[in-house]
Amino acid sequence: MGSKEFYGGIEKSPNRSFLKAMGLTDKDISNGLVGVGVAWSESGPCNIHALSLGNKAAEGVSHSGMTPRLFATPLVIDGMAMGNEGMRYSLPSREVIANTVELTIKGHGFDAFVGISGCDKTTPGMLMGAARINVPSIVMYGGSTLPGYYMGKKIAVGDVYEAVGSYQAGRMTVEELKIMENSAVPTAGACGGLYTANTMAFMSEGLGMALTGSASPPAVDSGKTKFAFETGAAIKTLVENDIKPRDVMTYEAFENAITLLMASGGSTNVVLHLLAIAHEAHVNIKLDDFDRIGNKVPEIVNMKPGGPYTMAELNEIGGVPVVMKKLLDKGFLHGDVLTVTGKTLRENLNEIKILNIKQDIVYDIERPKMRTGGIKILRGNIAREGSVFKASASSVMKHTGPAKVFDGEEAAFRALMDNKIERGDVIVIRYEGPKGGPGMREMLAVTAAVVGKGFDRDVALITDGRFSGATRGIMIGHVAPEAFVGGEIALLKDGDVITIDGENGLLKASVSDEEFNRRRESWRPPEPKYSTGYLSQYAKLVGSASRGAVLE
């Protein structure tokens, strides 16, 4: 039901009175109403500029001949919540954002949706909401921060997390750490590396839901403001041609997005998010699809944390379209899929020119960074439903060692700080899954400390929780089934030998089925951590990470 049904006719005079109280005219109302959703907050720098971009998008909507209505969505700044109780709210915020889009658009009879996103969960939340309401929709990522500098070297906030471990290991002074802290995030915008926010920005173009080239301009770049206006203006074409999100986000579009994820070596969180968006779009993709595509697509993007570059530098050579053009030209993408431009992906990329310059930000397909995709799906007797490994950010593909088991992130972090972790160990952090956490926290404080102590080649970590996109090293997340529901990770003990084999997709413990069954007899699920509030509700409804951790 759109604005004509909500506000048309004599009987809807009272409804129109509310619109006219805000200065709208009959013509404004008859032009059609577009909800412009902005993930804006003063909670952190990732989204502090988003309101100005939302206003510019609203100008574009007006310029197209439709009437914009701005609204805000809530958000959680992952980097600020990291290592704290607040991180439990990060993944659940994705569902709240999707719900906010649905409530606002459907609750007010808006005809279309324009989304301006930013930090990690805002882009997937908006795409989930768009797929669910299935009215003409378009999104634009608000952009990342510019690189910071430390002693003449470009840095991002992930370097500060690792510096904490370096300080604890005596490899950095507190004064040096403070200098890095003060300079890592110099402007508004999301984290600059190919972490979750920027990987989801890649996905917005890969799915066809954002204008070509709109993802990469930094938050403070004038190009981002231009794209905000053009994004708003583009909604009229979508409405006139009745192009809806499920017309764009097809199975082939998701294959394109997974291909782009593998070629970029982006954040493992995006596996969760693509599964969740597909769920809302009624598209059946599974972890097997990531495995299948990842085994044939080379990794060609050389950005942090697996490389030295940031989104700002990718933008200098043409942005995400350069990556997609290289993939399309070699037959890795479906070129005939529809996009929010009203054109096919191939038509959009036909206009893209790859600069003939010497650079190592995006490799050629023939000479890739890795022969296969940057994310591996691992399975075995402690991950029967699967787990994820960011191979692009690890120089080690195989590791075998004794388990040191911790119930929760804090216990593992204390063990690291107390020098109780030795080279060769496999840290196991459990009861951090979607239900058990609840909220499936990211383990960046621990993983960064592992790297900061110089253990990134010698210590592995497995968890039913998540990892920040800034994570690097031998880190395996999303282990499913999770501990809280009785997954085998709940049955591991100190000293169990864990084998990680990224090349062959294997994650297993040297524990027989019979021994696991014996241990299960004495296992009991822990009491839920929350009995009231949103996290209590979330824990009751959320499903497995292997299905995107959606509410079921």
Swiss-Prot record:
Cofactor note (record): Binds 1 [2Fe-2S] cluster per subunit. This cluster acts as a Lewis acid cofactor.
Listed Pfam families: ILV_EDD_C, ILVD_EDD_N
GO molecular function, one term: dihydroxy-acid dehydratase activity
Keyword set, alphabetical order: 2Fe-2S, Amino-acid biosynthesis, Branched-chain amino acid biosynthesis, Iron, Iron-sulfur, Lyase, Magnesium, Metal-binding
Active site: S468 (proton acceptor)
Pathway membership, UniProt: Amino-acid biosynthesis; L-isoleucine biosynthesis; L-isoleucine from 2-oxobutanoate: step 3/4; Amino-acid biosynthesis; L-valine biosynthesis; L-valine from pyruvate: step 3/4
Residues engaged in binding Mg(2+): D78, D120, K121, E442
Highest taxon of the lineage: Archaea
PROSITE patterns xref list: ILVD_EDD_1 (PS00886), ILVD_EDD_2 (PS00887)
Main EC class the enzyme belongs to: lyase
UniProt key word Magnesium: yes
EC number: 4.2.1.9
Residue numbers binding [2Fe-2S] cluster: C46, C119, C191
Modified residues (N6-carboxylysine): K121
Coiled coil: none
Protein role: Functions in the biosynthesis of branched-chain amino acids. Catalyzes the dehydration of (2R,3R)-2,3-dihydroxy-3-methylpentanoate (2,3-dihydroxy-3-methylvalerate) into 2-oxo-3-methylpentanoate (2-oxo-3-methylvalerate) and of (2R)-2,3-dihydroxy-3-methylbutanoate (2,3-dihydroxyisovalerate) into 2-oxo-3-methylbutanoate (2-oxoisovalerate), the penultimate precursor to L-isoleucine and L-valine, respectively.
PANTHER family the record matches: DIHYDROXY-ACID DEHYDRATASE DAD, DIHYDROXY-ACID DEHYDRATASE, MITOCHONDRIAL
Family listed: Belongs to the IlvD/Edd family.
The protein's name in its UniProt record: Dihydroxy-acid dehydratase
